[in-house]
């Protein structure tokens, strides 16, 4: 047993924890779930954004870890998730001439509930300094029960840039890419402020709705 494993065992006695990915005892992430968070960057297309680079597929252990991080205050998952997002950022920057990162902001309700913005927190952990220029212009309904067209209509006009982005070549950053409605709205707000949208990097994409167009990590 390694020293790190021994220390984790001792910590589990005084502060019981379970794996954010599967619920196994005594580890924040068990040895079976850690490999699931190894980024395998894929690219996708969004009509309003262009290329979207995604680190992970939003399914299985990945989905459970992201939900635990966002909804159950499992901030111990922040480092591995930030590491995965950083690889998507690297791929995006290698393909696009980017001058600024702009994070898609949490909803006001989400920010009040958590006390922090999960995407900003991931970027900070990854050593990035995003521009905090997008804000809610109005409240949007929850997207979960809406069809694709309804999601786009629900998000339209919900974001605004708080200052000029003239001359900025922007890479948008978000957590999960599903229909593209949120990213498209963020792109609209950036363009309205004078910025150019060069694409987006996301932590995960929803594979049931999108088929990858190419793999960027050497796998076929």
Question: Which residue ranges define each predicted feature?
Answer:
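Glycine-rich phosphate/pyrophosphate-handling loop used in enzymes and phosphotransfer proteins
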Residues: 1-220
């Amino acid at each position: 047993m390694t020293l790190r494993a021994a220390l984790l065992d001792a910590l589990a006695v005084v502060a019981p924890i379970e794996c954010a990915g599967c619920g196994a005892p005594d580890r924040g992430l068990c040895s079976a779930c850690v490999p699931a968070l190894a980024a395998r960057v894929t690219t996708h297309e969004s009509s309003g954004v262009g290329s979207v680079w995604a680190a992970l597929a939003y399914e299985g252990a990945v989905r459970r870890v992201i939900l635990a991080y966002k909804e159950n205050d499992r901030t111990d998952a922040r480092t591995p998730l930030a590491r995965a997002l950083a690889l998507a950022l690297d791929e995006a920057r290698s393909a696009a001439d980017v001058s600024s990162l702009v994070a898609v902001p949490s909803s006001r309700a989400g920010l009040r509930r958590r006390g922090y913005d999960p995407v900003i927190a991931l970027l900070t952990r990854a050593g990035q300094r995003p521009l905090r220029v997008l804000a809610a212009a109005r409240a949007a309904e929850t997207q979960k029960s809406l069809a694709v067209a309804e999601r786009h209509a629900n998000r339209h006009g919900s974001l605004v840039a708080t200052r000029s982005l003239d001359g900025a070549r922007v890479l948008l950053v978000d957590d999960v890419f599903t229909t593209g409605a949120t990213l498209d709205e963020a792109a609209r707000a950036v363009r309205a402020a004078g910025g150019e949208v060069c694409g987006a990097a996301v932590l995960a994409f929803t594979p049931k709705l999108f088929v990858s167009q190419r793999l960027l990590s050497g796998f076929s």
